[in-house]
Amino acid sequence: MSIVSLTGIEVLNNPAKFTDPYEFQITFECLEPLKEDLEWKLTYVGSSDSLDHDQELDSILVGPVPVGINSFLFKADAPSPELIPASELVSVTVIILSCSYNDKEFVRVGYYVNNEYDTEELRENPPAKVAIDHVVRNILAEKPRVTRFNIVWDNEEGADEYPPEQPEDEEEEEEEEEEGEEEEEDEDEEDDDDDEDLNGDAVVDLEKEEISTPRDNDEDIEIDIASESEVEEGGVEEEAKVNTPKD
């Protein structure tokens, strides 16, 4: 559970010139006392193609933070135009307002920013070189994108970093259960081997050939009995032909 919850952000000084500072009235709730300060940071995304053009406009430490509802005014300077690609100065970009505790970010709010010229003439016929003094920004304050992250707070040190250790007794019981299961499997395999030795070729025949129906078994028994009776009585060694009821 997050100890600090962001409850509201009011975007001030909007719309404004590109070179004007950013202003935010930030409100958050703290559920428990914090040992460290909160770090708030505003980042301007200078290019959609590379992070190298991102600019950290300002950062501020807020603390000590009392329990309850807290509010403060966060101001940040405008980005440096010379650090932004000329093709992306007059376009749509993003600013990111984030908060961290103990160098761990737990909330991030992103806003789209539309940069355009302040006159219709410049919008229709933009100059070859960007006239930054005539560029205005408009933050889409009504459509923020909020992302939250789980972190370890003061009262949760080590709670999420390492899994709980199992007692040694439980580990020994699990090992004994595994050994018992292995012994039972070995015994089952030995029993299967004994069955094959006792049945001889019959087991092999069942694996290689189709299983006979009860009627076929009866016929085989009759053949064996007839053959044995003929050998005992007449001493005839020729194979006896036994016709089935269909024959």
From Swiss-Prot:
Biased composition (Acidic residues): 154-199, 217-237
Coiled coil: 165-193
GO cellular component: chromatin; chromosome, telomeric region; cytosol; H3 histone acetyltransferase complex; nucleus
Annotated localization: Nucleus
Ranges annotated as biased composition (Basic and acidic residues): 205-216, 238-247
UniProt-listed SUPFAM superfamilies: ASF1-like
Main subcellular localisation: nucleus
InterPro entries per UniProt: ASF1-like, ASF1-like_sf, Hist_deposition_Asf1
Gene Ontology biological-process entries: cellular response to stress; DNA replication-dependent chromatin assembly; nucleosome assembly; nucleosome disassembly; positive regulation of transcription elongation by RNA polymerase II; protein modification process; silent mating-type cassette heterochromatin formation; subtelomeric heterochromatin formation
A matching Pfam family: ASF1_hist_chap
Segments for region (Disordered): 151-247
GO molecular function: acetyltransferase activator activity; histone binding
The entry's keywords: Chaperone, Chromatin regulator, Coiled coil, Nucleus, Transcription, Transcription regulation
Protein family: Belongs to the ASF1 family.
Subunit structure comment from the entry: Interacts with histone H3 and histone H4.
Function: Histone chaperone that facilitates histone deposition and histone exchange and removal during nucleosome assembly and disassembly.
Protein name from the UniProt record: Histone chaperone ASF1
Lineage: Eukaryota, Fungi, Dikarya, Ascomycota, Saccharomycotina
Gene expressing this chain: ASF1
